């Protein structure tokens, strides 16, 4: 488990390129036949990926000491979106088939969660966010047909994109975790511009569907102290509540957003005009 401490905005603005990457970038999300796990002190979110190829993968009791529990989801809820080939997630003996872009919410208290790929030639890639939970909501599969899609932006401003809301109150109940998938239309490059902050939630972006020769310049920092982190395919970035979170790519791309914090009101945000950015 890679533990990331909270960081003050006054400290963050003094960091150089490598310093910013050390604090906020999750460089390697998927490793064959293993789980990756980054624990952020910011709202206690856990972020990672699971890519089973030759064997099943589960998070065992080895994380118990670091989380102060006897099993992973004893006091946590889990959200998973599969960006790879078809796979299965077995929760306490109940098997769910999770295809490409299917998702699974797993409620607090699930003791055994086992991940597998159906075809080792095209393995599943399970990207997950995990957050503290105060009660148990039912485990539920969510397919792309069940999400709440919203199309925003315009080709003229190069920010036309479709936001697919997987784990939001309109789709299912969670304690605090919200997740969704945003896909840019071909030829569009900007996400979340004009940008915003939200004091009551933090957010993690996971960028994917990018060619090897492409990148995204992820914008972060306070609106008057912006910085950037160069992102490549299948990398994630942590965004504190005080930071904007936006990006521009060399080509169109897709990203998964996950939020935890005080509320789940999607529109509870503080908008920043482009003219006010520095």
UniProtKB/Swiss-Prot annotation:
GO terms for biological process: D-galacturonate catabolic process; D-glucuronate catabolic process; pectin catabolic process. It comes from the Bacteria. Its EC number is 5.3.1.17. InterPro entries: KduI (IPR007045), KduI/IolB_isomerase (IPR021120), KduI_N (IPR027449), RmlC-like_jellyroll (IPR014710), RmlC_Cupin_sf (IPR011051). Gene3D superfamilies: Jelly Rolls, pectin degrading enzyme 5-keto 4- deoxyuronate isomerase, domain 1. Its cofactor is Zn(2+). GO terms for cellular component: cytosol. Keywords: Isomerase, Metal-binding, Zinc. Zn(2+) binds at residues 196, 198, 203, 245. Binds 1 zinc ion per subunit. The bound metal seen in the crystal structure was tentatively identified as zinc, and its requirement for activity has not been shown. Pathway: Glycan metabolism; pectin degradation; 2-dehydro-3-deoxy-D-gluconate from pectin: step 4/5. Transmembrane segments: none annotated. One of its GO terms (molecular function) is glucose-6-phosphate isomerase activity. The keyword Metal-binding applies. The keyword Signal does not apply. Homohexamer. Belongs to the KduI family. Catalyzes the isomerization of 5-dehydro-4-deoxy-D-glucuronate to 3-deoxy-D-glycero-2,5-hexodiulosonate. Plays a role in the catabolism of hexuronates under osmotic stress conditions, likely substituting for the regular hexuronate degrading enzyme UxaC whose expression is repressed in these conditions. PANTHER family: 4-DEOXY-L-THREO-5-HEXOSULOSE-URONATE KETOL-ISOMERASE (PTHR38461:SF1). This is 4-deoxy-L-threo-5-hexosulose-uronate ketol-isomerase. It comes from Escherichia coli (strain K12). The gene is kduI.
């Amino acid at each position: 488990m890679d533990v990331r401490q909270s960081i003050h905005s006054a400290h963050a603005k003094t960091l150089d390129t490598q310093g910013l990457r050390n604090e906020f970038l999750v460089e390697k999300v998927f490793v064959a036949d293993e789980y990756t796990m980054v624990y952020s002190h910011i709202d206690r979110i856990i972020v990672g990926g699971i890519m089973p190829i030759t064997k099943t993968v589960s998070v065992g009791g080895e994380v118990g000491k670091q989380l102060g529990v006897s099993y992973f989801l004893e006091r946590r809820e889990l959200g998973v979106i599969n960006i790879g080939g078809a796979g299965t997630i077995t929760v306490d003996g109940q098997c769910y088939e999770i295809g490409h872009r299917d998702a699974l919410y797993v409620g607090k208290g699930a003791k055994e969660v086992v991940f597998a790929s159906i075809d080792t030639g095209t393995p599943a890639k399970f990207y997950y966010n995990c957050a503290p939970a105060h009660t148990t909501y039912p485990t539920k599969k969510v397919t792309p047909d069940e999400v709440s899609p919203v199309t925003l932006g315009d080709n003229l401003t190069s920010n036309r994109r479709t936001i697919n809301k997987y784990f939001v109150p309109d789709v299912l109940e969670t304690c605090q975790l919200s997740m969704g998938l945003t896909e840019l239309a071909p030829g569009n490059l900007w996400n979340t511009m004009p940008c915003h902050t939200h004091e009551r939630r933090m957010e993690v972006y996971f960028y994917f569907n990018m060619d090897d020769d492409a990148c995204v310049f992820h914008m972060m920092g306070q609106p008057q102290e912006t910085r950037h982190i160069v992102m490549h395919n299948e990398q994630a970035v942590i965004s504190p509540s005080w930071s904007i979170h936006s990006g521009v790519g060399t080509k169109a791309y897709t990203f998964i957003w996950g939020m935890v914090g005080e509320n789940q009101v999607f529109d509870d945000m503080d908008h920043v005009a482009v003219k006010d950015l520095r």
